Amino acid sequence: MCVIQSAISTAFVDINIKEKLMSYSIPCDKSSFSEIGCNMNGISIVPYIESKINKYQSPNSESLSFQFSGCAMAQYKENGVTYAAHICLYGMGNEGDCREVWNEFIQKREITDVILFYPKTEALQILQSEKCMETGKSPQIITICGYIKGEKCYSAVIDIDEKKVIKEIEQIPLIGVENCIIRETGKKPSSCVIL
């Protein structure tokens, strides 16, 4: 069994994923952050929230998020507490894009142990599109998910109706300062930034 399939089977043993995700479609305040999620059998579920950095505590350093089409996923510690985050990215300079908010957040706060990756890959996006056309299901049902366990990162195309992983890949995350450089200045930030 692949890693994400095992996590989905554990977290959603008796629960419909679609109903759980749709229950998060609630209006949030106008700040750039939200803290919405849940812990399901030891796995933190961090949903996508439009135009937000949605963070949620991840006490076991194991988290799962869905509906990636260009957003980033991160895990970090703040004041000794581990969080997972789904960071909304619409393209630099576009309304609702949270990269500058994230970059400022990690550079001005006491943030450590940052792991950052982009769950969507071109190959997964093509597979997602093919499966949506083949099955007639929407991209909210045949979706790209991200999964972080410890320092390992994974992406997958999954069918949330069937709780089934269609394809999974292990990703190489950006970890710590040595892999994160701001292109314009060449300076190393205090932690991982989104370029």
What is each stretch, according to the model?
Residues 1-187:
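Active-site microenvironment for binding and transforming phosphate-containing groups
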Residues 187-195:
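Short acidic, low-complexity intrinsically disordered linear motifs used
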